[in-house]
Amino acid sequence: MLDSPHNPGSENAAPHDVVIVGGGLAGGLIALALHRHAPDCRFMLIEAGRTLGGHHRWSWFETDIRPAARGLMAGFDLNGWDEGYDITFPSLGRTLPTAYRSLASAEFHAKLIAELPAERVMLETKAASLDAGGVTLADGTRLAAKRVIDCRPFKPSKALSGGWQVFLGQQFRCETPHGLTRPVIMD
């Protein structure tokens, strides 16, 4: 998504192969994949907030990530239930066998900060504009790049249509054991 006109002069001095704007789940995982699988790639991850991943809990079915791509999640402190999950409705419930995973943003941030080179992550740095040749930061600094990936939060656009699911993940610490062995998914 272009925020400003392309600056053709920036291509000649592109110190970055890729600049990723937005350090949420998508941006953080892209940076991690580049670090692990393209070690010569000169990338920069820019996040406006103090932490990567914000304040979220991401949960997914094991089958949501194809087997060949699951290695990207290696090393994250995941909650996981291999025996499946329970679903409940007002008058019925059942157990489904698909493994379920969950990751808190604090663990996401900790893992990325521990693994990504410090010089490749900019926290508390706001991007003022993006174009095909790089990113201009709020302080006026220009980061020239061969490629820019916009991973900032979704903004409504007439050019896009679709829907999404709203997810509320809650984690409770109980004074006494609750006896649950699987997560409960409620629709």
Whereabouts are the PLM-identified features?
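A short, compositionally biased domain-edge/stem linker segment
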Residues: 1-9
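N-terminal Rossmann-like FAD-binding beta1-loop-alpha1 element of flavoenzymes
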Residues: 9-45
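Glycine-rich nucleotide phosphate-binding loop and flanking beta-alpha elements
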Residues: 27, 52, 155-157
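Short glycine-/acidic-enriched loop or helix-start segments at secondary-structure transitions
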Residues: 30-31, 55, 158-161
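N-terminal FAD cofactor-binding segment of flavoenzymes
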Residues: 33-37, 43-91
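Predominantly flavin-linked oxidoreductase catalytic cores and closely associated redox partners
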Residues: 37, 119-187
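Long, hydrophobic/aromatic-enriched structural stretches that serve as scaffold segments
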Residues: 86, 101-105, 123, 133-134
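Short beta-strand to alpha-helix junction loop
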Residues: 94-114, 151, 172
